[in-house]
């Protein structure tokens, strides 16, 4: 089908098949291929965290981050956080802290993460991992945390409990026990929803006939989404724009198109400011 389409958006493919399928398609096709459960979620996560760190006055390269759930979305979130400058990241799954295990025992999709993380990590359970950390990112299952777990973290903690339909901690408790709290649900503030990212990413990629969606384009998309919240409006309950914000898609499209051109994957030359609507 590739000759008749400008891009392919993969949806609802479980790990580890999603990594293998996306890699095979990207290698064999000359049109953009993106698994939005991975990269769409990761882009919006980075946008939300960028703004959350501004609110609490912390820096990406200084904070200690726990990512719980290393499936499709969790693995992609780790990768984009590392690309954005995170320097202390702890990866957990149902077995606890897993990225510090023997490389030969890790799934293939995790060995590259292990090569990028710092070696001074704790060993043990998720609860051990939380001690002295600044950010919790949950992409796992509901109700794995309680108030005492969050109190093991540093002050001004940021908690993104993104499991659906039930977040990793009961929302009322999570909101009370953290400085900034976000979920994947629309009935609470700060919804982290991949619908904020993939329409604009593909719009920008298609407009310049990009041959791929690369890391620079995803980082640019995250920056554009974060920028849709004016600095003067940023607050604990407003770190990410609404999915109904009409400015998001065109703004993301323009920055993605510019990043595609800057990285040499755009095959159509257009005036970014004038031709992207």
Task: Show which residues each predicted segment covers.
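Glycine/serine-rich phosphate-binding loop and adjoining beta1-alpha1 elements at the start
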Residues: 1-64, 261, 265-268, 276
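General beta-strand structural signal in soluble alpha/beta enzymes
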Residues: 9-12, 33-36, 67, 91, ...
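Short, ordered loop/turn segments at secondary-structure junctions
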Residues: 12-15, 36-39, 94-97, 141-142, ...
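Generic structural signal for well-ordered, non-membrane alpha-helical segments
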Residues: 14-18, 22, 38-42, 70, ...
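Glycine-rich phosphate/diphosphate-binding loop of Rossmann-like nucleotide-binding domains
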Residues: 35, 43-137, 141
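Adenosine-phosphate binding glycine-rich loop
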Residues: 36-37, 56, 161-270
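Rossmann-like adenosine-cofactor binding region
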Residues: 110-180, 186-187
């Amino acid at each position: 089908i590739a000759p008749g389409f400008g891009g392919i958006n993969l949806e609802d493919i479980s790990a580890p098949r999603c990594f293998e399928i996306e890699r095979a398609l990207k290698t064999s096709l000359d049109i953009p291929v993106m698994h939005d459960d991975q990269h769409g979620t990761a882009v919006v996560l980075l946008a939300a965290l960028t703004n959350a760190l501004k609110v609490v006055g912390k820096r990406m390269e200084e904070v200690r981050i726990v990512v719980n759930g290393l499936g499709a979305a969790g693995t992609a979130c780790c990768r984009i956080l590392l690309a954005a400058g995170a320097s202390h990241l702890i990866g957990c799954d149902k077995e606890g802290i897993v990225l510090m295990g023997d490389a030969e025992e890790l799934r293939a999709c995790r060995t590259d993460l292990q090569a990028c993380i710092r070696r001074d990590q704790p060993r043990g359970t998720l609860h051990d991992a939380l001690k002295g950390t600044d950010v919790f990112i949950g992409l796992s299952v509901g109700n794995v945390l309680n108030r005492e777990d969050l109190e093991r973290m540093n002050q001004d903690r940021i908690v993104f409990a993104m499991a659906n339909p039930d977040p990793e901690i009961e929302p009322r408790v999570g909101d009370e026990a953290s400085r900034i709290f976000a979920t994947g649900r629309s009935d609470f503030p700060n919804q982290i929803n991949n619908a904020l990212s993939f329409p604009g990413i593909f719009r920008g990629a298609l407009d310049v006939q990009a041959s791929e969606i690369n890391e620079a384009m995803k980082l640019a998309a995250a920056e554009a989404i974060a920028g849709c919240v004016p600095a003067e409006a940023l607050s604990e309950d407003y770190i990410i724009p609404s999915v109904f914000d009409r400015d998001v898609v065109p703004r993301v499209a323009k920055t993605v198109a510019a990043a595609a051109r800057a990285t040499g994957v755009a095959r159509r030359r257009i005036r970014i400011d004038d031709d992207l609507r």
